[in-house]
């Protein structure tokens, strides 16, 4: 096998490993950061009196509602909260604000950007990627 073929094979294996680690180790870090941001930016904003929040049992902070995908071409991880209420994405409503059924307006409570900033500043995502790749032999 030529050096070029060896390098191409290595790069293909590395790309596959990066995608795997992003979908497992790094996405777990991202989900934890999102969960914390939901508690700090959304749940701490007010205590509802008309309804009970589902929180970690099917609510916005439930990691089971967070779907991770990887764009292989750009090596980009995206974690999206897929929780919906009456056909509307709850995260989108919370991020942008919405009108309640009683007519009251709920202000925007952005949490994605704070989660991303905190996660990147902590170095946890980078550490998870490095550790995951080492565990796969890279």
Specify the residue positions occupied by each region the protein language model found.
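Short, surface-exposed beta-strand/loop "edge" segments at domain boundaries and coil↔beta transitions
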Residues: 74-78, 83-96
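Short, Lys/Arg-rich flexible segments
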Residues: 1-76, 98-138
